């Protein structure tokens, strides 16, 4: 390399300075040219040109794209006077590129952008075309050579980000708002609804059948308006897409719900749509393929709350943003440094293997952007300095806090936009047999793995809260429609209407679910109801439970709270006893009182939002429901004078209700494995060892006995029988019944079980089965609270069926984070045929309702027709 001196160098300096000034002037006159672009590249490129004049041919390849003043510098060595013509040549050489953007309604928008324009220029043009002001939740995506989705960086030149010749982009939601109700404008919610509908159809957002129907009905109401019998004839929703695997049954359910939304505006329908969609477990989760340290395929999901880890479509861990100290990547490895826990001294680093370096960087960028947008008040400035280790990338847009402040300042009339009859997701797109898909620039290839498989498993493992949403996704309109079907006293009606709105929605959803089941002609519940009625009419069973205590609701929904008691209130005229009406009224009053106390607990619980894996303590205790206070239990004692007299030796001050998170059926049977309750509690204590395995095995006392449980969220109904002062009727046991043929109940007493599982797991009351005709009460002093705990067993006698349940809970702790696996084995034996499909469905539904934050990953059914040797030996003895 040579250094030039003398007058020639001065001429060159003049040549270098003169082209820069016109170029800067051209940048000002062209609105899409980014400011400050010409200086760094011009200086560096010109340095190469002045020092290496022997390579003009090599440099000429980049002239069109990088700097157009360089050619002038070469031609002006002998004739500097020609420099005056260079500005005209520069203005002509500035080229523009055609950008095609696929919008959320599948339409295309074309615009012309200067070739050196930054991503923000194109994004602003698209938002202006859409008349969108709350644009910080959205972004533009493009596909690279590997067909991977990438976010367009608004602070960098488009030309440096997209290498392919056609500039195709997709306008999508980048940050899903945790509470869509906080969006200011209807048009913003409309585009968010379009994005969620695309997510549902492509399988990225799994839903249950009930959720598909509900969200689909709101989408129809928003686009078609009120149901019109003349206009909407036949299957008028068959042309629209609502689910990956759409069935005729789903379309009929959507039309049935659509008819009930008369008077609901499109904006209100979209709000209801978003309020239900945000509860889905995969809402706003951006998935990326990865492998853990052992080489097992996993998925890393980034959302507003943190980083989620999925394996085999099951979420196995969650790292909340406050728990993460540092996010980094090196080559194809992605690392997160975890804040030490309460009992740890050092930080721990967890590494994941990504497919390649680009994937690791892409995931790192997504994490940086989500953390900055949702957690920080203002974006962090990029690091400054000549030598900076690592990437300088930082999120440069507005944070959610800044977006809300800006949205509050929006002062314009609501923009007009047309919700056209949906041509976006129509069945005609799949007439060729291919499944519907958005354009290639929109499809998210890095997250299509497990979610594609989830479409087949929606009924079982579509989402951790999909079943729980069935009790939350109804609207007041539906309540008005079905309210005349409920026969209640005026006093009870007023109490019911005083409940909060969420309780009303849960109540209505429970009734709707139960009604659909009871309408089936082959429903086992109808036969069971008849058996209970027959037992009630028998004179030999004066203390048999009334229809309100039947297990028909228990076998249908464990989430059925006060709604189950409402459903079966109509009196049965077949009862011959003259005093049955008085007993029903007493039962009703007691049940109403107990229901009110329980609802207070549920309202208290609904405000507890604890992450199951954000820390060790949170995961262990995230299912604590609440507790009764002394006043509530005193009223409970007054409503049960017989029990109050029996407990005179020690006054019970409080009763703690807790849901045992570790064993979904360890609470279920009280006949065996009862001494394991301290072990079961130890599994819930924060001071747990690194690995614990808890096994609670319960066996029946005889082939005639079936032990059942009452879950903590069950609505308790109790009454005192005049025939026996120690007999207490069990109310509505909210468990799934694993028998398909209803047993004929012959016992005279069903005792109520209230299992106490304290938050720390210590001092749980032991359950000792007493005689089947007498309720056995046990009091155990809690070392934590210092209160007596009232417990009793619940026994029922069947004729020919017996059930054995084995629960195996494995909890592995690694680095302060735990992984819980629950295996449950249910054996049903008896002479009568058992409908294994019914039993399996009930078992899965019970497991989901007990553990809404966990997924059912595997269900295996074995059927043996021959009876076991023990049963052969027992049958002669029973006869």
Swiss-Prot record:
PROSITE patterns, sorted: FERM_1, FERM_2, FERM_3
Polar residues composition-biased segments: 76-87
GO CC entries: cytoskeleton; cytosol; postsynaptic density
Primary site of residence: cytoplasm
Role played: May function to confer stability and plasticity to neuronal membrane via multiple interactions, including the spectrin-actin-based cytoskeleton, integral membrane channels and membrane-associated guanylate kinases.
The protein's assembly and partners: Interacts with AGAP2.
Designated name of the protein: Band 4.1-like protein 1
Gene that encodes the chain: Epb41l1
